[in-house]
Amino acid sequence: MSKFDVEQLLSELNQDEKISLLSAVDFWHTKKIERLGIPAVRVSDGPNGIRGTKFFDGVPSGCFPNGTGLASTFDRDLLETAGKLMAKESIAKNAAVILGPTTNMQRGPLGGRGFESFSEDPYLAGMATSSVVKGMQGEGIAATVKHFVCNDLEDQRFSSNSIVSERALREIYLEPFRLAVKHANPVCIMTAYNKVNGDHCSQSKKLLIDILRDEWKWDGMLMSDWFGTYTTAAAIKNGLDIEFPGPTRWRTRALVSHSLNSREQITTEDVDDRVRQVLKMIKFVVDNLEKTGIVENGPESTSNNTKETSDLLREIAADSIVLLKNKNNYLTSKERRQYHVIGPNAKAKTSSGGGSASMNSYYVVSPYEGIVNKLGKEVDYTVGAYSHKSIGGLAESSLIDAAKPADAENAGLIAKFYSNPVEERSEDEEPFHVTKVNRSNVHLFDFKHEKVDPKNPYFFVTLTGQYVPQEDGDYIFSLQVYGSGLFYLNDELIIDQKHNQERGSFCFGAGTKERTKKLTLKKGQVYNVRVEYGSGPTSGLVGEFGAGGFQAGVIKAIDDDEEIRNAAELAAKHDKAVLIIGLNGEWETEGYDRENMDLPKRTNELVRAVLKANPNTVIVNQSGTPVEFPWLEEANALVQAWYGGNELGNAIADVLYGDVVPNGKLSLSWPFKLQDNPAFLNFKTEFGRVVYGEDIFVGYRYYEKLQRKVAFPFGYGLSYTTFELDISDFKVTDDKIDISVDVKNTGDKFAGSEVVQVYFSALNSKVSRPVKELKGFEKVHLEPGEKKTVNIELELKDAISYFNEELGKWHVEAGEYLVSVGTSSDDILSVKEFKVEKDLYWKGL
């Protein structure tokens, strides 16, 4: 089609065709109207990489650092480059729409998807979102900013009612979306599951029409989160353009036609309005086909798995890393120290959080591998303590045939798919699908096959392989399912997940609790493993995740006390040691929130024992949101490494060895303990609602207002060099603020980057205001001794307004203000006062 004319096509569509465009046809595709040349459009997760169209057996992809890590770069140019790379990844999957970035707020540290979003600060979150969206859409790929709005916890997320003041809604939770619309104009926005002040977001006229469409003049497409549509008429009338996934539940021809024919429900104009926005999204895709080369329903490939991709992922991961402590400049060295490695995350490939952010990565470099790569030789290692939430690893540690070499081709398990359960199969029944499984966490809810009815995905999987222990000892096997499962070892049933099921956290909270069995195994002996799995409809639990999924695991049992002693002995034996600890994609995941800020299991005991044995041990933490460090005063060197994507291990090694001078800054405040955080009393859905009791005082706004100390403040991060900052010029007009800041690298050894952070304070406001608020930042790279001037231009109304609930408008108060420039919210190096002579009121962008 040479010209995709939205209005012309709208006029030519019949009613049934229009209705069909109001919902997806499956998990990842919109409806094709062949008669009019309207193509199907493929969408794909997600926030830190492009999975493609399969949770199960998906084509590998590049994995980026998680959202809080990306925002900790404080680098708009780098984030735009990351968005461009995400677009290239999307093109390799023939997906025209990326379901990201995630732009919700961290009210507190426990949110299951807190790692996915950028920041506790709405300005940083909004500008990070804008940069990533610009990168994506500049390459012709549509972005989807999500989840609109107040989707800030997982507890009862489909029904939870977020009770939030109008001022907090505007200043904190809507603000990142407003900034994204203003600066990047995303093609799509995804609505949230939850309610806000009584109305489901996916059918809220106030949010979708009054604010997004009328006030902000946004003209993109609104899609639901998956299974996040709750009505037919209200959602159509109030602005939700398309329901995901398909097949539709709420927008069948019968339901929509009934609503059209019922008095005071919806009109043909309402349907046309929704279809028009879907067509505008498709127009964006079609108009960019020459640039993207995307093929409708085309194959998915790993063509973007290149050295250039790896190098950029490594750069992004390294620049996200935050140096938290470096007492006596212990890490300020470029020598090739032979670090000996300890810790549960050292050999784990903790590349991302869980849920929609998880994916089958091209590869993942573990921290241990990164250090070995840097040194060119193996180093001593011990685990010290386990930190898993549940046991995985069966597929990763099994062989298809133990008699053959243990290479990549022979690694994993064979999965055979059948229409009947094993006890009902005839001897000659052949599987309708056979594949190899390399990952133990298997999600099948988007599995498609001609033999499987998508509305009732009833099938069975036989999983087989061989496990060969590397040591004598006790081993723990595990199984959890959404569906049903039986785990056999040498044809003996060891775990039953078919009968007497108990609900647990698996499969977004729809599946079972983990069940385990400890067995004594012999080194080198071949053990036949078999799992008989029945798909989602066979589950004894009520849930709605289609074909479901399963996770089978095995791990060597350890004596915790003995392992901690081993770790301390290793640390004491060597001058240089690094301890890699943290969370993973089970502790931080979509579907549920963390219960506390604790490091898992006996991690803290491990850290204390190692630090006592060797105080110079470098601690590296991996998490997407804060954890408690009860041993903080004892640590001399501490690094926050987030979930670093494919290149996490190489990036960590680059920072430890001084090849990259750390330049990340914390995208959220780091409290000492859970009870300190602003949402402590209100981070749970109770009686169907969650009260945003901290109001506008989120993150550092709260800590500063209460003068409550934190372990590490917002915007904080050390370097291997030092900097000076000073405001050299400052001008205020009726609508602009211009700030010039001189920045000097005062070190003589390392080039490095510093982030100039600009905060504003209202000194005599008539309403309660934060002590200060971030409204500008700029990253600058300097050679030793070099000085540069950074110029930052801001709109006056964006810098100092608050939302006046009484008037329903933004309000710039006449009065006195303070601009503060520093390297964190707690390290202000230069200030200037200024005055605004008259009040200003405004709405919109």
UniProtKB/Swiss-Prot annotation:
Q: Please state the Enzyme Commission number of this protein.
A: 3.2.1.21
Active site located where? D225
Record carries keyword Glycoprotein: yes
- The answer to whether the entry has keyword Nucleotide-binding is no
The reactions it catalyses are: Hydrolysis of terminal, non-reducing beta-D-glucosyl residues with release of beta-D-glucose
Q: How does it assemble?
A: Homotetramer.
Which protein are we looking at? Beta-glucosidase
